[in-house]
């Protein structure tokens, strides 16, 4: 493998991981802005709509450790791509949800994908970067998460 190819691959991996982690993190809080609108659109109360947020966060919290194990067993790339696909599918279902229960279920699907993305991201970066550059790459990913 040539040095140029290796350099290109590691930066592509960092960009992919940063995008996936950013989307998963952003989705955990951005829905809060829309809660009053969701309450109005679905003609329901805040007690029902709050589960849109809780379902996503609870799913990630429950699945992030098992997702890490799945990544170790099935391979980083395959699991990361599956995480992106599941997250995207969940996002599509969220956009098409006709009711709050279906929206909550769609957020659970999103949470499964997000858990795969979040658990696998640091492992992908650790594998892609040499030891002397690893800290900077992980720091860059941390900056993206906190942005």
Language-model segment annotations:
Residues 3-147:
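Transmembrane-helix bundle of Major Facilitator Superfamily
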